[in-house]
C-alpha cells in the first residue's frame, strides 16, 4: 500500500505558503478582482496562491500533474494535485472570513483518479482539516497538534442538521421541490456555504449537506476528509467520490434519505 504521509506533509507546506499569501491580501483596499467567463469573480490573491502552490510542486513533485481552478491542467501521469486556491472567493473579496485553500492529491485507480490526500486550510478562521487514505481525518493547526474527526451518529431526519450554499442552483436544476421538502423534515437548516459544511459533517456538527453544481477542485479535498471521518460523499446520482459535478455528503446513516429527497420529481 502506498504511503502518502510525505505527500500530506508537503500539502501542509503548500497550505502554509498559500495562507501567508492570501491573508496578506485579505481585506486589502486595493485588491484587484476580475470577472471570469463563467461570471464568477477571481482575485489577484486566487492567482497568486495557485501560482505559488504550482511553483512548490514543480520543485518537490516534478513528475506529478497539477489541476488548478485558475490555470487548468499541467502535466500527465498517475498522480495529480487538484487545487482550489481560494474556495469562497465571493466571501474573500467582501471581507467574510469563510474561505479556504483546498489541496488534494489524486491517484489513477480503477474507475479514474481518486483522492488519496486532502487538506482544507481556512486561515481567516484559524482552522485546518486533512485526511490521508486509510489513515483517518484530523483537524488542528499542525500535524503535531491535531485531533481525529468522526461524523455524527444521528440516524433520523427530524434530529438532523442540513447545510447548503444557496437556493438558486436547486431551482435551476428542477430540484427545488425536493430540496424544500427535505428542509421541512430536518431539525435545522443553515446556508454555511462552500467548503465549511463538508468540514462540519466530518466533525459531526452537521449531519447532511449538498450542492447542485460543483467542479472537481471544489470537491476533491472535501470528499476524502468526509469519508475518512466515517461519512459518505457522493454525487446526487449516488456515485462515490467527487466526479458527478455536484455533491451530497452525510454521516452515512442518512445518505439514502438525502439522495431520495434531492432526486424526487427529477
UniProtKB/Swiss-Prot annotation:
Disruption phenotype: Cells lacking this gene exhibit an auxotrophy for histidine, but can grow on minimal medium supplemented with histidinol. One of its GO terms (molecular function) is metal ion binding. Mg(2+) 2 binds at residues 84, 87, 218. It comes from the Bacteria. Pathway: Amino-acid biosynthesis; L-histidine biosynthesis; L-histidine from 5-phospho-alpha-D-ribose 1-diphosphate: step 8/9. Signal peptide: none annotated. Substrate binds at residues 69, 86-89, 190, 218. One of its GO terms (biological process) is L-histidine biosynthetic process. It catalyses: L-histidinol phosphate + H2O = L-histidinol + phosphate. Keywords: Amino-acid biosynthesis, Histidine biosynthesis, Hydrolase, Magnesium, Metal-binding. Mg(2+) 1 binds at residues 69, 84, 86. Its cofactor is Mg(2+). Disulfide bonds: none annotated. It holds the Pfam family Inositol_P. Its EC number is 3.1.3.15. It is an enzyme of class 3 (hydrolase). Catalyzes the dephosphorylation of histidinol-phosphate to histidinol, the direct precursor of histidine. NCBIfam families: his_9_HisN (TIGR02067). Belongs to the inositol monophosphatase superfamily. This is Histidinol-phosphatase. The lineage of its organism: Bacteria, Bacillati, Actinomycetota, Actinomycetes, Kitasatosporales.
